[in-house]
């Protein structure tokens, strides 16, 4: 067992794996809650297996927003202690577990890979848009989804937020894209 653990620790580049997992996590955000959970858990596991906690803590200490997120999660966790209904408190706290991913992304994502994360998110939103328009124009159906509210994979409120975020990314890409073909594609996608 010890040799297997040594083999993996010596031969795996955890940071490369983490960067791929972050891209897959971004892809799943508008499409699959199960995918978000799976890749979120894998991100946490590989981040812990990577170790290098001293450098990670130093990075986190330099970013106040990440510190605030960690403080919020810590306070939320300790609030279970004074809750009268522990089961409800734990269930409510589960909503915030995705915030654990933010320090992992901050400490692991390489600057060169940020474009891949945004592109994965945009591609999954494109898939979601195509399915949504298909439902809206009644080209196909999906159980429980009506043409009047064609948000196929997530609830309407989340889908609206994802659409707004997608719009911001697309505007950025339209303004700063040097490739004319891609610029036209982003304009059509935006419309």
Residue ranges and their predicted role:
Residues 65-72, 86-109, 116, 120, ...:
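Aromatic-anchored transmembrane helix interface
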Residues 77, 114-144, 154-191:
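Alpha-helical transmembrane segments of multi-pass inner-membrane proteins
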Residues 77, 81, 89-92, 144, ...:
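Residue-level preference for alpha-helix termini and adjacent loops
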Residues 23, 69-70, 145-146, 190-191:
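Short hydrophobic "helix-edge" motifs at membrane interfaces and signal-peptide entry regions
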């Amino acid at each position: 067992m010890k040799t297997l653990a040594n083999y993996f620790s010596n031969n795996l580049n955890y940071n490369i794996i983490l960067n791929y997992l972050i891209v897959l996590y971004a892809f799943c955000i508008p499409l699959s809650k199960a995918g978000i959970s799976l890749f979120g858990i894998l991100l946490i596991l590989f981040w812990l297996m990577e170790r290098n906690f001293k450098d990670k803590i130093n990075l986190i200490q330099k970013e106040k927003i990440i510190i605030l997120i960690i403080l919020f999660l810590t306070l939320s966790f300790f609030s279970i202690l004074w809750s009268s209904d522990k089961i409800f408190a734990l269930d409510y706290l589960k909503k915030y577990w995705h915030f654990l991913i933010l320090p992992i992304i901050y400490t692991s994502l390489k600057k060169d890979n940020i474009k891949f994360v945004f592109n994965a998110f945009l591609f999954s939103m494109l898939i979601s848009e195509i399915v949504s328009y298909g439902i809206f124009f009644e080209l196909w159906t999906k159980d429980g989804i009506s043409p009047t509210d064609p948000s196929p994979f997530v609830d309407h409120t989340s889908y609206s937020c994802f659409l707004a975020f997608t719009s911001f990314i697309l505007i950025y890409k339209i303004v700063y894209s040097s490739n004319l073909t891609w610029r036209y594609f982003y304009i059509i996608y935006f419309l």
